[in-house]
Structure formats: structure tokens, C-alpha cells
Design a protein with these regions (language model features):
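Residue-level markers of secondary-structure register and packing in elongated scaffolds
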Residues: 1-10, 36-95, 133-193, 200, ...
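Short loop/turn segments immediately following beta-strands, especially the blade-tip
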Residues: 14-18, 118
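Extracellular beta-strand-rich, repetitive "passenger/adhesive" scaffolds
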Residues: 20-24
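Short polybasic amphipathic segments
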Residues: 25-27, 126-127, 196-202, 219-221
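A surface-exposed, glycine/aromatic-enriched loop/edge motif typical of exported proteins
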Residues: 86-115, 235
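Extracellular, surface-exposed repeat architectures
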Residues: 110-128
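Extended, non-globular alpha-helical segments
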Residues: 206-216
Length: 273
């Protein structure tokens, strides 16, 4: 037995008020937390509130994300981070700048990443990050980025990565799906597939078995014999996991691009996501 994990949704009213609805989620409630979403007139998310803090998003007239005010992102300090983004005429990001969190005018930059696209024939190919050149093979696979060197096979199948003190190798099955990863720092990880779904993972003394829901998203992970359920946000990021009693055991935070920025909770170090 155990506690059922329930996610409840409400939606924005449609053109006829409470007699109609839209596909836009207004609130999403799970594991005791309610997230409230706001949108602009084109359906872009402009705010996500958990009842304590709100992450806000700003877009330009082309719908490009140009600013994020995130009180949970600690890049610029424990009080949060405001990110400002600049793009070229082709929509490629050119600059990503972090400031101390504010919803008003920003102060001095804390961090700035710059992106260059200098290939005359491939206008949106990233050729340098923060002044460090990125090289590619003839079909566009990266070969080096200033830190890692990459090896490829069968077109776009990555076979290995190497940097100072670390080497990673990958193996695949006949369908081209990854079945093994071996790294200097973490040893060997084996992946057991059912069709295209990962159903079992073995990593040292860690064993994980995965079950999927009707939308083919991971719903349950059995970690070393104990079951945990996945929690998702509206953007389909895994934001946490709960145990059989419905208690939150791990929580994940992401940036606006879906990249993880922090992990907390009792299972933070277990890599069950």
C-alpha cells in the first residue's frame, strides 16, 4: 500500500468566461504544492508562483525570452538571479548575463556568457563560447569545446568523451540505443531497454527500475527496492519525487531553458531522476 500521488489542474477561462475553458493551465497542485501560472496574450508563460516566490519571464515582440527574474536561482547569490538575454537577427542567443535578483532595473553584471556564430555557410552553428572555439566534423558533430574532446560513429552516435583526468565511453545496441556508459569517475552504468524506453539501470550498487504512464513519461522509479513517484511541472520538467507516503524526498530546480540548477532533499545524491 501507500499514498496515491494526485495532480490536480485548473485552466484559464475561455472567451465565454466560466462557461468555457482554454488549454492553458492556471494552477497545478501536487504533493502539497500549488503552482500558479500566468501568460501573455500569445500564450507564453510570464509567471510561475508557488505561493511563496514567483519566477517571472519577459519576451520581446518576436516572442524571444529576454529576461528571467528567478528568486530561486543562486547564480548571482542566495537572494536570486535576474538573467537578461540578447539575440542576433537570426534568433541565435548572443549574450546571457546574470545580475542580482530584481524585478526593476538591473545593477552590475555578476556573470556574462557570450556566444559566437562565425561560420559563413552555417549561420546558426555555435563556433565559440566565451571566446573559446568549438570545432565540428563535416556533418556538424562537435569535436572539441575547449574542455572536452568528442568521438563519433554511425553519423551522430557519440562513442566517447575525454578531458583532463576523465574519460567516458558509450556502447549501443543494434537499434542504436545506448546500453552502457563507462566513466573514469563513476564506473560503468548499464541501461536495459524495452523498445525505446529505459526500464532498468544498474550503476555500481544502485539499481533502478522505471514504469511509464499513459503518456509514456516515467511515473515510478524503484530505487534499490523502494518505490518513488515522479512529480512534473507544466513544462514537463521532473521537479521532485515522493515516497510511498507522499513525502517529498528530492526536489529539482531548473533555469528557463530546462537545465537543472539545484537539487535538494534526502535523495539529492542518488541521481534517480
Amino acid at each position: 500500500g501507500g499514498t496515491a500521488v494526485t495532480t490536480a489542474y485548473t485552466y484559464l477561462d475561455g472567451a465565454y468566461g466560466s462557461n468555457s475553458t482554454t488549454p492553458l493551465v492556471r494552477t497545478m497542485t501536487q504533493a502539497g504544492t500549488e503552482l500558479t501560472y500566468t501568460y501573455d496574450e500569445t500564450g507564453n508563460i510570464t509567471g510561475i508562483s508557488d505561493g511563496q516566490q514567483e519566477i517571472t519571464y519577459v519576451y520581446d515582440l518576436l516572442g524571444q525570452l529576454i529576461r528571467v527574474n528567478d528568486p530561486y536561482d543562486t547564480t548571482a547569490g542566495t537572494a536570486g538571479t535576474t538573467w537578461v538575454f540578447a539575440y542576433d537577427h537570426g534568433g541565435n542567443i548572443q549574450q546571457k548575463t546574470a545580475y542580482a535578483y530584481t524585478t526593476g532595473s538591473v545593477g552590475a553584471a555578476v556573470k556574462c556568457d557570450t556566444f559566437a556564430y562565425t561560420d559563413a555557410n552555417w549561420k546558426d552553428k555555435l563556433t565559440a563560447l566565451n571566446g573559446v572555439n568549438i570545432t565540428y566534423d563535416e556533418i556538424g558533430n562537435p569535436l572539441s569545446d575547449g574542455t572536452w574532446q568528442y568521438k563519433w560513429a554511425q553519423g551522430r552516435q557519440i562513442r566517447g568523451m575525454q578531458k583532463s583526468g576523465e574519460e567516458v565511453a558509450f556502447a549501443y545496441n543494434a537499434d542504436g540505443l545506448r546500453v552502457q556508459k563507462t566513466a573514469t569517475s563513476t564506473g560503468t552504468t548499464k541501461y536495459i531497454m524495452h523498445g525505446r524506453n529505459l526500464v532498468h539501470l544498474i550503476r555500481g550498487d544502485e539499481n533502478l527500475h522505471f514504469f511509464y504512464d499513459a503518456q509514456n513519461k516515467p511515473a515510478i522509479a524503484i530505487y534499490n527496492g523502494t518505490a518513488y513517484a515522479y512529480l512534473y511541472n507544466q513544462q514537463d520538467d521532473v521537479v521532485g519525487m515522493v515516497d510511498s507516503e507522499g513525502q517529498l524526498v528530492v526536489k529539482y530546480q531548473y533555469d528557463a531553458w530546462g537545465q537543472p540548477i539545484s537539487t535538494g532533499g534526502a535523495l539529492a545524491e542518488t541521481r534517480v531522476r
